[in-house]
Structure formats: C-alpha cells, structure tokens
C-alpha cells in the first residue's frame, strides 16, 4: 500500500452545502422623510447594516441620495415628469431627515418637447439663495406661432434669441437671489416658467417654458436647527433626556 493521503476518505459527504446566512438578517429598516415644503413627507424605506463595533449605521445613511417623482411628493400627477433628488443630512431614531439636492426632467418628457419648425432656446444661471445655497438653474423654452399666423415655421432670429435669453437670466436671478432654498423649490415647478412666458411675449411668443434642471453646487455649513425647522420639528427634542453628567459629581466627591 502506498504511503500517503487517501483522497477519497478526506472528501466530505456529497450533497451537503455550506450554510449561508441571510444578508437581510443583519440589516435595519429606516424611514426616509422629505422636508415639510412637500405635501407628502413619507418617501419610503431604506436598508442599512446594523451598527457593529466602529461601523455606525448613521454614518452609512448620511449622504445617501434618493430620486423621487415630484408627483408622489405633491400628490399631483401633473408633476410626474419631474424628478427630485433628496439627500440624507441627519438621522433621528429610525427616521432619515433629507434636504433638497436637485431637480431634473425625465428623458421621455424632454424628447417629447423637441419638435420640427420651432426654435429651442436654452439658458443656465448660477445663483445664490438667501440661506447661502449655490445653485445652477437650467431653463428651456420653445417658440410658438403668433395669433393668425399662416406660415408653418416659427423660427426666431439670433437677436431675438439673445434678447429672450437675457430676459430668462434676469428673471431667474431676481427670483432665486431673494428667496431661501425652501421657498425656491415651491416656485421652480410652474411659477418661474409662466413669468418668463409673460415677460418675453413682446419679443417672440413662447411655449413649454420650464426650469428643466436644478444642480446644487455648494451647500452652507450644516445646521441641525435649520434642518429640524425645515422638517417642522423643534431642536430641543429629547436632547435633555439623553445627556447625563453623573460622572462629574463622582469626581468632585472623590476630590
């Protein structure tokens, strides 16, 4: 008999599989809350690994970005083509408190707006709100037929396009620089577009005027009080109950 390892004996029994642990058993569920500027605040749920050792679940949640349809947040199907980005800034209990992080159009809506025989006019403006948020707003507009127009094309001259773009820039700058981020999020969906349409009617009639995208370039230093106010909560919630300073008295007694 040859001296050595018997390979057949060392093999395990056939059919036995390694026991695998369900990855979801190590996770916790947190609720995502939208700011009080929106009609519906419950965005949904998010999963995160439980706090183990030095890995804190709250640190994993902070900074997460969620993309939600504005129709769901405002309970209005007319806003279904707008997508809002919300960023988690603070975690309280099992709730993730979010703040506005940006806005965008769905690709199908943008494609449906572009048509033949009209001029597309675009403009982008970088503005700073009163609460020190630096934003870049992208506007889109299309020319339309004048009343009683027979010609099928509605092409604007380059001088008219420049004049319209200047008006768009002025209106966005005026509206955004005099408001907070929360006030601006209410105006973006419809109000600014309608105002641009009225102001530029004398230059060339416009249709489908929208703020198609909002990009957050820079945020101010994080302020918990401001975030809680945005969510309609007081900053004094449970703070006094959690902090205990009993160890100080023991030190004084020993001295």
Swiss-Prot record:
Basic residues biased stretches: 1-18
GO biological process, one term: translation
Any Pfam family the entry gives: Ribosomal_S3Ae
Gene Ontology CC: one annotated term: cytosolic small ribosomal subunit
Signal peptide segment: none
SMART domains: Ribosomal_S3Ae (SM01397)
Top-level taxonomic group: Eukaryota
Xref: InterPro entries: Ribosomal_eS1 (IPR001593), Ribosomal_eS1_CS (IPR018281), Ribosomal_eS1_euk (IPR027500)
Composition skew (Basic and acidic residues), residue ranges: 19-28
Positions carrying N-acetylalanine: 2
Transmembrane segments: none
Gene Ontology MF terms: structural constituent of ribosome
Keyword tags: Acetylation, Cytoplasm, Ribonucleoprotein, Ribosomal protein
Places the protein is found: Cytoplasm
Renumbered residue ranges of the record's region Disordered: 1-28
Family, as annotated: Belongs to the eukaryotic ribosomal protein eS1 family.
Quaternary organization: Component of the small ribosomal subunit. Mature ribosomes consist of a small (40S) and a large (60S) subunit. The 40S subunit contains about 33 different proteins and 1 molecule of RNA (18S). The 60S subunit contains about 49 different proteins and 3 molecules of RNA (25S, 5.8S and 5S).
PANTHER family in the record: 40S RIBOSOMAL PROTEIN S3A
Protein name per its UniProtKB record: Small ribosomal subunit protein eS1
The organism of origin for this protein: Blastomyces gilchristii (strain SLH14081)
